[in-house]
Amino acid sequence: MRKNRATKREILPDPVYNSRLVTKAINAIMLEGKKGLAQQIVYQSFDLIKKKTNEDGIEVFKKALENIMPSLELRVRRVAGSNFQVPTVVSKERKQTLGLRWLILSARKRNEKSMIEKLAAEIIDASKGTGAAFKKKEDTHKMAEANKAFAHLRF
């Protein structure tokens, strides 16, 4: 076990939008260290969003992320030999991380041609309150509501 908790590294804002949130999205999309490619995907999907919706790409992205960030999550707790799914409140940092993760995973599963189109379509859907990422959040909240009885088993 480690002696102290690891310190959080500061994430630098991205060069185009000067936003830490966009940097987190780029880092989440990045595979095998190809950051330049990840940046292209994110920026071009923001441009595509602007073309399709006539709204600023980053504003639609922020709205989409706001719609899919969960306020509750389920954590498994073992009590007396039984596993219980305990609903817990999610911190701001984890909300953001889960929202980005769900957005990108559901974008990767879509059927559009390129990742740029997939990401843009998923962001637009999430901003409207539809799409796979939004459904994932709704399912998580329903499960948390169903397991409300175990909330007293907090961590």
From Swiss-Prot:
Function: One of the primary rRNA binding proteins, it binds directly to 16S rRNA where it nucleates assembly of the head domain of the 30S subunit. Is located at the subunit interface close to the decoding center, probably blocks exit of the E-site tRNA.
Quaternary structure and partners: Part of the 30S ribosomal subunit. Contacts proteins S9 and S11.
Gene3D superfamilies, per database record: Ribosomal protein S7 domain (1.10.455.10)
Segments traversing the membrane: none
Alphabetized GO MF terms: rRNA binding; structural constituent of ribosome; tRNA binding
Organism, as annotated: Malacoplasma penetrans (strain HF-2)
CDD domains membership: uS7_Bacteria
Protein name: Small ribosomal subunit protein uS7
GO BP annotations listed: translation
Keywords linked to the UniProt accession: Ribonucleoprotein, Ribosomal protein, RNA-binding, rRNA-binding, tRNA-binding
Record InterPro entries: Ribosomal_uS7, Ribosomal_uS7_bac/org-type, Ribosomal_uS7_CS, Ribosomal_uS7_dom, Ribosomal_uS7_dom_sf
SUPFAM superfamilies attached to this UniProt entry: Ribosomal protein S7
PANTHER family assigned: RIBOSOMAL PROTEIN S7
GO cellular component: small ribosomal subunit
Any matching Pfam family: Ribosomal_S7
Similarity comment text for this entry: Belongs to the universal ribosomal protein uS7 family.
NCBIfam families in UniProt: rpsG_bact (TIGR01029)
